[in-house]
C-alpha cells in the first residue's frame, strides 16, 4: 500500500522493472537490530532493511522504498557474515532474473530466507513505499 495516498500498489507498479546491468549498486542493505538469544532461548531475531538506490527509485517512479524484514532464526552466525551472504544471494537471484522490480526483490528475499538459508522459522515483512504523485 502506498503510504502517501493510501491506495494499493497496482500490478503494473509492482512488476515494472529495470535491467540489472543498467544500474550499479541498486540496493542498500543494513541490519537495524539484532537480538541475540533473548531470554536464554536458542533463537535469534534479526531486523534488517533493504533500501532502493536513488537511480533505481528514479527509474521505477518511486519516491521512497524501505523494505523491513524481521527474521526469527536459529542461525548462530555473526551478523556481518549473515548480511554479506544474504546480500550476495539476493544479488545472485536478481542477476539470474535480469530485472529488478519490487516484486522480484521480495521474491529474492523469500527465496534466500526459506530455500538457501536453513533454520529460518518466521519472517515478518513491513514496507514503507511511496510512489511519485506526478
Swiss-Prot record:
Signal peptide: none
Keywords: Host-virus interaction
GO biological process: viral process
Domain of life assignment: Viruses
Alphabetized Pfam families for the sequence: Gemini_AL3
Keyword Disulfide bond tagged: no
Subunit architecture: Homooligomer. Interacts with the replication-associated protein (REP). Interacts with host proliferating cell nuclear antigen (PCNA). Interacts with host retinoblastoma-related protein 1 (RBR1), and may thereby deregulate the host cell cycle. Oligomerization and interaction with PCNA are necessary for optimal replication enhancement.
Protein family: Belongs to the geminiviridae replication enhancer protein family.
UniProt function note: Increases viral DNA accumulation. Enhances infectivity and symptom expression.
UniProt-recorded name of the protein: Replication enhancer protein
Organism: Tomato yellow leaf curl Sardinia virus (isolate Spain-1)
